[in-house]
Structures are given as structure tokens and as C-alpha cells.
Amino acid sequence: FHNIYSYTSLLDKKALLNSSIPLDEIENDFLDKFIYLFNEIKNETYYNKMMYVFEKIHLVGLLQRLDVSTMAASVEARVPFVDHRLVEFAFSIPFKYKMKWCEDRSKYNSRVLMSDQISEKYDTPKYILKKAFENKLPNEILYRKKLGFPVPLNNWFDGKFKKYAKTILLGSAAKSRKIYNIRNIKKMLNNDRLHKDHDFAMKIWMLVNLELFSQEYFDN
């Protein structure tokens, strides 16, 4: 599960970052925290333990990103779906309603897939919420295809942003930092997959953000 959950695999990190960085140790530290939280609550189902881990790790990250981005724009955000009473209620609901498979074999078919590969193909997202509002909202709204907040990274890298990424990641500041595998990053920046494959482009996007963060807060 940990390997599927991660945005970037350990092998990818080793390919993108300098070999002097103790990535195995860092990965094990995170995994230890994951296991500790999973075992922290006793006498609970496997699914509720997973929910608990997500509450303590994943949700915290989402809320932090929301707070930072909204406050930067002088906006006060509210998150009613994380009201403690609603979260406690969610833990009490049988798992078969929280993860509503389309068919009996859907669970098996999706066992090694990422959530974006499962959603709406093998399950019904937010099933309980949709059922609760069936008499209040038309079906074309309730059951329309889910749309997140996609960023067309692969399209961006087909234009000026690719040149910008090269300037940032292959520049003297990035090289002097000695945390990147410049040779592999250069190969990726010249790979045609960059403007065809969103997941491939995401790795370069994350590195650009890391380097810009480093320049802003460590170099000045």
C-alpha cells in the first residue's frame, strides 16, 4: 500500500536525487511512522485503521496546503467536512457503504491501482453523500463525472515552461546544491514523454518547486 500511495516511488527518487542522500533511511522512517499509527488503535477493522492513518498523515497535509494557499490570498477557508462529529460518524459507518464497488469483482480488479484509476470505473465515489441528496439534487448533478483540479503539466512542458524548467534545474544554483542527479534530470527534460505523460511531467514539476523553494529560503 505504501508504494501505491506514494507520489514518487523510491526508485524514482533514487534516479532524480543525488546518491549521497540517505533515501532508504528516510523512506524507512516514514514507513515506521505509518506502521506506528496503523497499530496505535486497537480492536479496529483494517479499514478503520487505514482511515486513521489517512487522518493523521494525508489529511494534515491537505489542510496545511489549504491554509497556506488561502491565507496567501487573504481568504479565510472553512472545512465543514472535517468537523469532529462528522469524522467520528464516518468511522462508525460500515465500510461497504464508504467504498461502494460497482460489481463484486471490482474490488479484485482494483487491488493494485491508484485511486484515480479506480474512481468511477470500479466504484461510486461519495456514495453516501450522493444517496443523502437524491431527493434534493437532480441526478445529472449528483452522478456527473467527477472533476478534480487537474493541472495540464504535460501541455505546459510543450511550450515555454520546458525552457524555464531547464533554466531552473540545470542552472548553477541547482548544480551547486548537490542534491539532484543532474544527468538523469537532463535526460528527462529532453524526453518526448515530458509533454505526453502527465505523471512523467509531474516529477519535473515537483523538482522545479523544490529548487524554487530552496532558492527562496536557503540562498537568500
Describe these PLM feature segments.
Residues 1-220:
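Adenosyl-5′-phosphate
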